[in-house]
Each structure stands twice: as C-alpha cells, then as structure tokens.
C-alpha cells in the first residue's frame, strides 16, 4: 500500500501495522469466525485458493479488497498455501470485543512457513520438513539445517560446487540464503541480510540455546561459516515460533566422510524415492517400505539417501535384520504393535513448542502403554536390538501422569472441553458438576412449572443462541404466571424466562465458561510439566522408528528373497544372481545376472541391443551396492562389497531448458563432474557417452572418457555403449572386460535374453527394435538398404542413428558379381582388345545370373 497508514480507518491501521512487520508473507487477520485477508494479500489468496474476492467498505477513500476463510477450516487452506511455497502470519484477537473502545486488540500468534511446520494436519507424515540456512565466506559455504518437529540440528561446510548434491540429499522445504548467494532451488528461498550471518553473534546465540558457555563440546567451534548459518537459522526460528525451543539441545557436524556420496543426477537416475516423472512409485522406497508408522517411513527414506561408510554401523543394521528375519513371529508382533503407535517424534516436538493438541497427549499416553510389550517382543539376540530394547524402556511417571490427566477419548480441540479427565482437578470437577446437574434441575423445574401454571405441554429447554427458556403453545400463552417474561415469539409458541431460570442460567453458563478456562489452564500446565521429558520422548521415538524399519526389512528379506551382504576389506563388488528390485516387482520373470569388479577387473564395457537390459543391469548393481551400504539386505544370491566412497550415474539425459543447456551439454556436465570427483573407491555408471553429437566426436569422447576412467581414475565402472570400436580397449587394458546382453531372432520376432555374457555383442539389432517400436515399413526397408550400402562401402557411420547399425540380415538379393569386377577395373590401362574381352566376360556373367 502506498497510502500513508494515518489515512486509513483505525482497524486498517492495525492491520497495516502488523502487515508491515511481515511484508513478504500472507496475513490471516482474525475477525470473528473468519480469517480475513486485505488488499494485495486478498487478491493473491483469491487466486491461489480459488476463493471469492470482494470489497467491503472503504479506507483512505478506496474500496477495501477482501477475501476470507472460515476459522474452523483454516488448516486446509494453510496446507494448500504452504504446498505452493507461501508463508502465512496468523494474527488472533486477544482483546475483549465488549470492552474495546476501538478495534479489538490483535497480535501475531504464530508464523507458519514451509520449513517450520509442526502441525499434524499440515505435515506430510512420510517425509521430514526441513529448513536450511546458507552462509557465504569466499568460496566456502556454511550450511545449517533443522528438523524443527524432531529437534535435529546439523551443519556442514563445503565449496559451492558441492551444494547441488547436498540440496538433493537434504531436500529442504525452505531455504534462508545470504543476500549475495546466487542460488537456484526447488523450494522457497528467503533472502537474509548479511548482518544476520554474523559468526560471533551466532556462536553466542547457539551457546545460549544449548545452555553451554561455548560450542567446543559440539565439534563445530572451528566451523565459523557453518556457525553463522546456524545462528541465522536459529534467529529465524525464534522469530517465527514466538516461544522457547527447549528440544533444541545440541548441534551436530556432518562430514562427507560419514556417507557414501551421491550427486543430484545419481539420486534422480536411481529413482530412490521419486521417479524421473516425480511420482512416489515405482521407486526403491515404494518397493521396500512396509513400515507401520510415519516415523519408520521417514527413517527409511533418510537411510536410502544417506548410505554409510561406517562398516560397524552398517553391519549392526544388517545383523539386526537377520535376527528379526529368523524370528518372523517376533517381527509380525512388532509390526502389529507399531501400527498402534502415535507419531511420538512429532508429538514431542509439539509439546516442546507448546502447540500440542489433546489427541497428541492421548496418543502419546497410549503409545507409552505399549512400550513394555514392544520391548518384550524384541528378540534377545544382537547388540543393536539390545540397545533398542533399552531405548524403549517404559516411562511410568509420564504415562501415569497422562492417564490421570487426559480423558480416554478427549475432544480434538481444547476449546470444545472434555479434555482433562475427571478427578484430576477438584475445581474443574466442581464446575463440571454444576453443568451436569443442569439436566436434573431443568426436569424438576419443568414439573413444578407445569403444576403451577396448569399447562401440561409446557417445556423447559435450551439452545446456544437464546440460552434457557420455558416454551408454551401460543394458545396457552394467556395462562402463564405473572413472573414469566417473554424471551422470544415464534409462529406457534412463546418462550419465557423466569427469575429462577435466569439465576440458574447465569450460574450454569458461568460454570461452563469457567470450566473451559480452567481446562485450558490445566492443559497448558500439563505441557509445561511434560517439556523436561521431551528429550527422552524423542529418544524413544528414534528407537521406535528404527525398530519399525528393521522389522519391515526383515519381512522384505523373506518376501523378496533378499540376502545379507558381506563386506570385504579388499576393493571389490562381487554380486551373484543380482536383481533390480523395482523392475523385478513390475515383471513376471526377471533374469538374474552376476557382476565381478575388482582391481584386476575395474571396468565392464557393456554392449548389446537397445531394450536388451543394459541400463537395468547397471542400475541394479548401483542399487544393490547402495542398499548394502544402508545396512539393508539385497536382491541377490550373494553379494560382497568393498569400501565405496561415492556412486555416480550418467544414464539418460534431457534438455535443461530453464538453464539454457542442451541434452549433450547436460551429458557432458555430468560426465565432467564424474571425471573430476570419482576416486578408485567410487562406483561409476555411464550409459552411451557421446551419443548427443556427431559420430566421430562422440566416439572420440567416449574412448577418451573410458580410457581415463580405467587408467587414471581406476574407479569401478560400468560403461554401456553402442560404439563397438570401444571394445578394442580390452586389448590395451587388462583391467577392462567386455560383456554383452544378447537377443535372438525368431522368425519375424526379436527375443531379448537379458542375460549378461562375456565378450562384445555381435549386433545391436537397432532396425529390429525400430520395427518393434512401430516405425513404418517403408522407413525400415529404406534403413536396411542404406545400412547395406554403408557396410558394402565400409563407411564409418556418421549420423547418430547409424550408431545402432550392425551386420543385419538383408531382405534384398546380394550385389551382382559383375559389380565387383567393374570396381576393380581401370579403363586407362586397358587396350582396345582387352576392353572388348572384358565386355564379353561381363556379358557372360549377366547371362549366367537368373
């Protein structure tokens, strides 16, 4: 608004004052039973939510644009706005309308942003809502991210080139970025001024939050840029939440050496939790996820995106799955109990932020009651399961408190009452008794008034609009006693109030209001009592989530015929009978394949027809390796995995239109990243490098890339190609082996065998695949003819499409033998007689052909 606030009405001045503090957020301004939005906010909300935009009254001489949503259904509108990346400020009425001479006082009660969600109705139970802050110090970036609902605070430092991989792994819902950082992200980005990233102030703020004198004990004291980011993030959370954050008790430094690194392209190509089209299935997570709780689902997602390099931690998970797989009854019992558990992690966060709801506490109470059974259902073997059994130890004090304090089936919201259990508070019990006794009093009053008035049809009733009243028919109205005062006249009845009924009404309604106020105070006090227990509750939640994942993977191990991977100190990837878990779930029969990679067999050069299974084979090797590094069982007859530091994939590509990059540029960028970043302990998957340019350029690039990987990088590499010339590299490098996937022609059909065999492929079957794809017959015929001509002329194929050419069966007759003699003929060396003899010879050849 460009008009000075003083020119507006008092209520609009109040609105604009609040709006000025949050100019880039939508303001939900409470007015009675609605949240109203005004001016530009109203226009934006009407467009995004498809609600009515109207005008009401005027301020500063102009109509006020307005849109609103009902108070009781505001949550669904908030969810839609947050999904669209908007942030919302909620201003509630805090003053008494009856006592206010001007506008009712309003204050901001909360600020809701995509990365600070804790409300159950706004959160996706299958994924964490994370908020990230990024600070800049030269070429170094300091990054902090927080799961507010769970109280997990992490930091790292990295160079700018590593940021895309971190964003792909963490997947923040909201980013707070230094004003000078050039950043492209898939989530809302809020720019913060440079002064908000002051490292000294950040260090003090963080130490104060954690109750320590400094940050030495957290392992982050020397990470100055990361501390600056964490301080800016904490300041933002304090501003938006407007409450203490007692569950934020520590911060953890994350380092690249903790994880097997995957860049953004690899996560996308392997379809870990999202397909290339953005769908949730079919993906690795959709195949593996049979967890019973939101906590378990989120943890499994985290594991898949954070494969570990710590062999002890990975082996502990693998062995725990093995114990549960060997005890299917225990795993099934655990699953049954976990289905009945509430989301303790998020409930704990809401308790800490003092925005828990009644059913959060009843859900927590019922979950705590299940802990002894859960602990008893865990098998006694294995160190990891023993630690989890200790972690879910019962909390009798908290459980007993909640049993005493909360109704067995409380109301969904506090304002409805019926939340605090009877017997918990004497004052509340007394107030409730007054309300409960109203029914008996009204029946007794109705009997007395019928006798006193002589009106047998007289009724004593109540409604929320008019309160208590005595109702008689219009025909009986003349018979009512003199102390009856008319309260309401309807078509067929009259409603009255007596002094006695009025006195009771005042007492009863006052008791109801006082009971609601008392219940609210008791509930808030109960949250205060529970807050010191939040760290323990979050530990229990972490254990429940891990038990859920381990039990689900024990079930998957049996159902999907998975095996426990072995870990080797020698550098290798040896998989026998490996299968692609996602593809196998989609097809009736899947052909298993082996892979052997070690220091004497570093690269497999894979040839074969399109649709033959090269990409599936490469991806399954990567997925099996990744699953093993997550501590999961794998789809194979056996698997032995050495130390792996990174997994790279360059499989398929498309134009980056927004970034102005062609398909070939995307391919080369991803390839360059691999060549710069891969080490001898990396797993690299490359599919058809060089196909996006001319044949000679592409072949030269593919040859150079393969040669560099096998001779310089020495990474474990699966290299699929249609450049058959590359198969000759096996003669130069003994660490490179040729393998192929074959197909067989059966009449007019082409049967793909999907089996990996040693040696190079003999054909690509490109024209047959084109025919299977429905390319018109004349085009196929022309392609065969051109292919024959190219082969006969021994020409090097030029266009990209010719890379699929190979020795194909021909439909046409073979070349005439006279043509061979003509090709060998040199007219300049022939005498006239020799020329005549040659002519007769050629004539004889043509006469001999049918």
From Swiss-Prot:
Gene3D superfamilies xrefs: 1.10.1420.10, 6.10.140.430, DNA repair protein MutS, domain I, MutS, connector domain, P-loop containing nucleotide triphosphate hydrolases
Signal sequence region: none
Keyword field: ATP-binding, DNA damage, DNA repair, DNA-binding, Nucleotide-binding
Superkingdom in the source lineage: Bacteria
GO biological process assignments: mismatch repair
A GO CC term assigned to this protein in UniProt: cytosol
A Pfam cross-reference name: MutS_III
Record: residues binding ATP: 608-615
Protein family: Belongs to the DNA mismatch repair MutS family.
Name of the featured protein: DNA mismatch repair protein MutS
Organism: Thiobacillus denitrificans (strain ATCC 25259 / T1)
